[in-house]
From Swiss-Prot:
Key words, A-Z: Carbohydrate metabolism, Cellulose degradation, Glycoprotein, Glycosidase, Hydrolase, Polysaccharide degradation, Secreted, Signal
GO molecular function: cellulose binding; hydrolase activity, hydrolyzing O-glycosyl compounds
PROSITE patterns: CBM1_1, CBM1_2, GLYCOSYL_HYDROL_F6_2
EC number: 3.2.1.-
Annotated positions binding substrate: 75, 77, 206, 209, 240, 300, 328, 332
Domain CBM1: start-end pairs: 394-429
Region (Disordered): 240-261, 362-390
Originating gene: GH6D
Function: Probable exoglucanase that may play an important function in biomass degradation by catalyzing the hydrolysis of cellulose.
Lineage, uppermost ranks: Eukaryota, Fungi, Dikarya, Ascomycota, Pezizomycotina
Annotated protein name in UniProt: Probable exoglucanase GH6D
Record bears the keyword Nucleotidyltransferase: no
Residues bearing attached sugar chains per UniProt: 237
């Protein structure tokens, strides 16, 4: 447990008797629902229609339940996607006006030279091209300004998934050279996101990555953030497949105190408590590997078979865990690896979404989630279409979602999820 402490303590300084005392008292998720992202619901419509075309009403209804009822985090993975914060704020305010109490989950994910080990989710910023300064001024600052301006809403923000994992275990020169500047970048984000309506969770990878005793040592990042910086806690298992709790740990977990994510939160939380650091966790269960799906813990890409996991709840049976929730939207590919036919990272992988539905947690009910907003159909979109263009032909419902570079033709995306930098990106206005 020595490696994670050094990084975390450095990010939140120890200049006062209890420098990491939470700014907000209590669990920010209690009494609230996790924001249901209409854009994710749109992507799932393709999955629902695929089941309906085969006469599979049961799985189509399970998809509709997810569309209507299951909240997910919104990933802000580049500068362009900062506009998705505005969409989330608008939709969350609409939900609030209907008497709901949403907490908006956002993932801050744009460090320069990110994903230095795997490379499947490398981003737009490079340290050798002024990346750290751009991260601060073009990404973190507007991100923070948008959230602070929406003081009528509550936000849970996950900070830089996998970054600490790569800092602890990354052995390449590329990872080693990125470590210091990335720590500075995360510390800056923590500083900028200090507000009573913002609840910060610093990502600590997962039990299979950092849960071994020799790796559990977080501290440097927290010192760098300064003595007035506060975080609520940590996120784990983001975009991974570990179960929250299991009575039958797979053989590859032998010898680890973190055979599942609840145990990881306990073992790491207890060690953090001894050092005066926060001990609260949120744990991603958007996708969970089925028993026997993996031969080793390091398998992380489009693992098959897997299913949608436990949807949002604060009934965690672990005092260290604030909530079980969905961070990674199931159906978005991890990269061109794992299950056959996988597209590049972030692109919609409908065959995978169908598999997740078929193997879904029992709480994903086959009644469609009645009582919520109707599931979006092909003509329903969370983004207002341009009045000068009409989708047609082979266009998908999400045709107005993306902002391409240099495209002056019709605002119409070909079939597929339109996201920045994927194969459909350049087709959209």
């Amino acid at each position: 447990m020595r490696a994670v402490y050094a990084i975390l303590a450095g990010l939140l300084a120890t200049g006062s008797a209890s420098p990491l005392e939470a700014r907000q008292s209590g669990n920010p998720f209690v009494g609230r629902s996790l924001f249901v992202n209409p854009k994710y619901s749109e992507s799932l419509e393709r999955t629902r229609q695929a089941f309906l075309s085969r006469g599979d009403q049961t799985n189509a209804a399970k998809v509709q339940y997810v569309q209507n009822k299951v909240g997910t985090f919104v990933w802000i993975s580049n500068i362009f996607l900062l506009r998705d914060i505005d969409d989330a704020i608008r939709n969350a305010r609409a939900a609030q006006s209907r008497g709901e109490k949403p907490i908006v989950g956002l993932v801050l994910y744009n460090l320069p030279d990110r994903d230095c080990s795997a490379g499947h989710s490398s981003g737009e910023l490079s340290l050798d091209q002024n990346g750290l300064n751009r991260y601060r001024t073009e990404y973190v600052q507007p991100f923070a300004q948008k959230l602070k301006a929406a003081s009528d809403l509550q936000f849970a923000v996950i900070l830089e998934p996998d970054a600490i994992g790569n800092m602890v275990t990354g052995t390449t020169a590329f990872c080693r050279n990125a470590r210091g500047p990335q720590q500075d970048g995360i510390a800056y984000a923590i500083q900028q996101l200090q507000a009573s309506n913002i609840h910060l969770y610093l990502d600590v990878a997962n039990g299979g990555w950092l849960g071994w005793a020799d790796n559990l040592k977080p501290t440097t990042i927290l010192q760098k953030a300064g003595s007035n910086a506060r975080i609520r806690g940590y996120s784990s298992n983001v975009s991974n497949y570990n179960p929250y709790s299991t009575n039958n740990p797979p053989p590859y977990t032998a010898g680890s105190p973190s055979a599942d994510e609840s145990r990881y939160a306990t073992s790491l939380g207890n060690a953090l408590r001894e050092r005066g650091l926060p001990t609260n966790f949120i744990i991603d269960q958007g996708r969970v590997a089925l028993d026997g799906a993996r031969k080793e813990w390091g398998e992380w890409c489009n693992v098959s078979p897997a299913g949608f996991g436990q949807p949002f709840t604060t009934n965690t049976n672990n005092p260290n865990v604030d909530a079980i929730l969905w961070v990674k939207p199931g159906g978005e590919s991890d990269g061109t690896c794992g299950m056959s036919g996988a597209p590049q990272a972030g692109a919609w992988f409908d065959a995978y979404a169908q598999m997740l539905t078929t193997n879904a947690h029992p709480e994903i009910r086959a009644d469609g989630g009645g009582g919520g907003s109707p599931a979006p159909g092909p003509s329903s979109t969370a983004v207002a279409p341009s009045p000068s263009a009409t989708p047609g032909g082979n266009c998908a419902a999400r045709w107005a979602q993306c902002g391409g570079q240099g495209w002056t033709g019709p605002t119409c995306c070909a079939q597929g999820t339109c996201q920045a930098s994927n194969q459909w990106y350049s087709q959209c206005l």
